[in-house]
Regions:
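Pre-Walker A (Motif I) flank of P-loop NTPase domains
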Residues: 23-29, 52-54
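N-terminal pre-P-loop "Q-motif" helix
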Residues: 6-25, 39-40, 166
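Conserved P-loop NTPase motor core of helicases/translocases
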Residues: 1-2, 46, 54, 58, ...
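P-loop (Walker A) phosphate-binding loop of NTP-binding proteins
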Residues: 32, 60
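Conserved glycine(s) of the Walker
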Residues: 36
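Conserved ATPase "switch" residues in P-loop NTPase domains
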Residues: 49
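Hydrophobic positions on the alpha1 helix immediately C-terminal to the Walker A/P-loop
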Residues: 40, 44, 64
Length: 167
């Protein structure tokens, strides 16, 4: 099975990819700028995905995470980019957790429920005691449903991502 040949990589990169593929849980690739770490990591991640259902990719900078993520997306790998969207490059914005969460099919229902919770809370402050009791029950049901939807959306997002990328 090993070593795997990658004719498009130089010998150092090929050795690094094979070492990553031989590790059990965690692999760290480091080195000076311009030495091919991104290319090496993308290949190692891509090959790992033939053996594992999901890979967590972490790097010290958002730029590095975005470079790796972009190259994986270009290869058709489903990536979920975690992190502050203001620090993510434009090409990767549609792959951020926040954007994917808001574009999930269940999000409109969740948004509507959150709106109802706000409106009900506002009415509760103005209502009589008996009205507030009924509204409390409604709020409880709304919150329970919102939690169910949030869990569903998160499960879908994380289960469908082959790569989860973050700083």
């Amino acid at each position: 099975l090993y070593p795997v040949r990658f004719p498009w990589l130089n010998s150092t990169q090929e050795t690094a990819v094979n070492k990553v593929l031989c590790t059990r849980d965690v692999a760290i690739v480091h080195g000076p700028p311009g030495t091919g770490k991104t290319t090496t990591l993308v290949e190692a991640i891509y090959e790992t995905l033939h053996r594992e259902p999901q890979v967590l990719v972490c790097a010290q900078s958002n730029t590095a995470v975005d470079w790796i993520s972009e190259k994986l997306v270009d290869r058709g790998v489903p990536v979920l980019r975690i992190g502050n969207p203001t620090r993510v490059n434009d090409k990767m914005l549609s792959f951020t957790y926040e954007r994917r969460f808001e574009s999930h099919p269940a999000y409109p229902e969740l948004w509507g429920i959150r709106k109802s919770i706000r409106e009900t809370g506002s009415r509760m402050r103005k209502g009589s005691y008996s009205e507030r009791e009924g509204m409390r029950s409604r709020m409880s049901r709304l919150r329970d449903r919102a939690t169910e939807l949030e869990i569903q959306i998160n499960t879908d997002l994380f289960d469908s991502a082959r790569v989860i990328a973050s700083t």
